[in-house]
């Protein structure tokens, strides 16, 4: 995967992977196409993981792209879980309120693999960076709204 591509390009490659695999399976004699699709997917997922792990989300484009990853209905769940894992490693190293906010959104995802992973990561990050959260009032407000929503849904 070329470094010049953005989040939307990476997302398109990852979203198209199930279709690419289905087409390759229709042509069992064409092993080269299958290998190419697998390499493209693996390279894209790896590049997305490494750039998410190693970067702060300083600009709005990166944050918008991460929301698109979370909201994509075509993205395989394993790829979204990999992205969530990159956020865990990044937050363990350096607290980023935008990534933590993304985790709060991921905790309400429809897929249980994603939302449970996000909840566990939130607990880990709150343990590691317990003193940091109060430095971000907007993030504390979002956490409060999240806890009220989950408490209300548990009571109903």
Task: Indicate where each model-derived feature is located.
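Eukaryote-biased recognition of long, low-complexity, charge-rich segments
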Residues: 135-156
């Amino acid at each position: 995967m070329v470094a010049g591509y953005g989040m939307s390009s990476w997302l398109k490659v990852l979203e198209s992977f199930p279709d690419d695999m289905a087409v390759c399976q229709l042509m069992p004699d064409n092993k080269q196409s299958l290998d190419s699709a697998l390499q493209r997917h693996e390279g894209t997922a790896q590049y997305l993981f490494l750039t998410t792990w190693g970067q702060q989300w300083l600009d709005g484009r990166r944050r918008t792209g991460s929301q698109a990853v979370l909201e994509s209905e075509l993205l395989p769940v394993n790829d979204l879980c990999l992205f969530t894992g990159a956020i865990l490693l990044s937050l363990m190293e350096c607290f980023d309120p935008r990534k933590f906010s993304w985790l709060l959104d991921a905790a309400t995802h429809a897929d249980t693999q994603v939302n449970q992973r996000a909840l566990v990561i939130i607990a880990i990050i709150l343990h590691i960076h317990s003193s940091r959260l109060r430095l971000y009032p907007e993030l504390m407000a979002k956490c409060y709204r999240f806890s009220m929503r989950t408490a209300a849904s548990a009571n109903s």
